[in-house]
């Protein structure tokens, strides 16, 4: 047996253990590997914060009362509870009032039913922390809003900002979705990277790398913009990335059809560790400039 095969088999035994001990930081001393930072190949950002979800949340009865102008303010949001690991299930609907709406009389006239709904919460909404240029009916923080709207037709990866689950819940959402304040979004600059990233970020390898690099918050894992932006993403060969991509597609298919995915997840871990031990990386002739293309709008 070759030396690198011995290293791999020993590491594979540890991977089996890590499935049973998901809070382990075994990889604290893992040797460095050829990589790019996640921020070099994807936009990583925080979600939109209303500051008072109860007021902006819509149910079917609310929606039935809205006029056509008011329906244009309805947006579909991904919350932490919708992140099921690999896939987003469902969404919640909120009234989203953009910051350029400042005149309360215009608001009241053009959106009477929404105005009436929000008016019930006015006193409490005024007690939110709001920048001086915002009105009581505005959202608290529309961070990354222009970027998100410009790229609303693209799929994104979402992950809860805080999680007690013993596994990562990076989840792929369809287009026309926005991130709420309790999730982080990841938008690859190259659409082809989305399935590879989804597989890698949900792997046991990445979970333990992330925990070892500051992601632990007591009994929870904290996925922050800063930590994720600076996470190392291996520059695997195209062959390795394609294998992971295809397995992730199989995982999503199985999840949508009520089938088990455990063996497929273990295959991803196997491929990642094997690729690192056997130096299956792209040549260094690939420049960062090329990795950053094509850039998204915004």
Swiss-Prot record:
An example molecular function term from Gene Ontology annotations: DNA binding
Record keywords, A-Z: DNA-binding, Methyltransferase, Restriction system, Transferase
Any one Gene Ontology BP term: methylation
Gene of this entry: mjaIVMP
Organism: Methanocaldococcus jannaschii (strain ATCC 43067 / DSM 2661 / JAL-1 / JCM 10045 / NBRC 100440)
Swiss-Prot/TrEMBL catalytic activity: a 2'-deoxyadenosine in DNA + S-adenosyl-L-methionine = an N(6)-methyl-2'-deoxyadenosine in DNA + S-adenosyl-L-homocysteine + H(+)
Annotated EC: 2.1.1.72
Coiled-coil residues: none
Keyword Methyltransferase: yes
Gene3D superfamilies: DNA methylase specificity domains
Highest taxon in the source lineage: Archaea
Protein name per Swiss-Prot or TrEMBL: Type II methyltransferase M.MjaIV
Enzyme class: transferase
């Amino acid at each position: 047996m070759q030396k690198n095969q011995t290293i791999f088999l020993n590491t594979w035994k540890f991977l089996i253990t890590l499935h049973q001990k998901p809070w382990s930081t075994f990889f604290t001393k893992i040797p460095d590997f050829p990589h790019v930072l996640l921020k070099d190949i994807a936009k990583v950002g925080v979600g939109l914060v209303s500051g008072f979800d109860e007021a902006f949340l819509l149910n079917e009865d609310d929606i039935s009362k809205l006029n056509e102008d008011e329906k244009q303010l309805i947006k579909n949001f991904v919350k932490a509870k919708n992140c099921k690991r690999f896939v987003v299930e469902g969404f919640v609907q909120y009234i989203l009032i953009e910051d350029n709406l400042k005149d309360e009389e215009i608001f009241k006239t053009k959106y009477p039913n929404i105005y009436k709904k929000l008016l019930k919460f006015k006193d409490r909404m005024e007690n939110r922390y709001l920048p001086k240029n915002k009105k009581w009916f505005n959202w608290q923080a529309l961070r990354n809003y222009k970027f998100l709207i410009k790229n609303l037709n693209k799929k994104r990866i979402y992950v809860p900002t805080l999680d007690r689950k013993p596994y990562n819940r990076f989840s792929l959402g369809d287009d026309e979705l926005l991130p709420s304040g309790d999730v982080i979004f990841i938008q690859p600059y190259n659409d082809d990277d989305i399935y590879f990233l989804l597989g890698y970020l949900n792997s046991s390898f990445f979970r333990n790398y992330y925990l070892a690099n500051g992601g632990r918050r007591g009994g929870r894992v904290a996925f922050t913009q800063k930590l994720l932006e600076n996470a190392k993403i291996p520059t695997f060969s195209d062959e390795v990335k394609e294998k992971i991509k295809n397995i992730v597609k199989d995982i999503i298919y199985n999840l949508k059809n009520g089938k088990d995915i455990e063996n497929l997840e273990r295959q991803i871990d196997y491929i990642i560790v094997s690729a690192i031990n056997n130096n299956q990386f792209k040549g260094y002739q690939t420049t960062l400039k090329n990795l950053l293309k094509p850039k998204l709008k915004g």
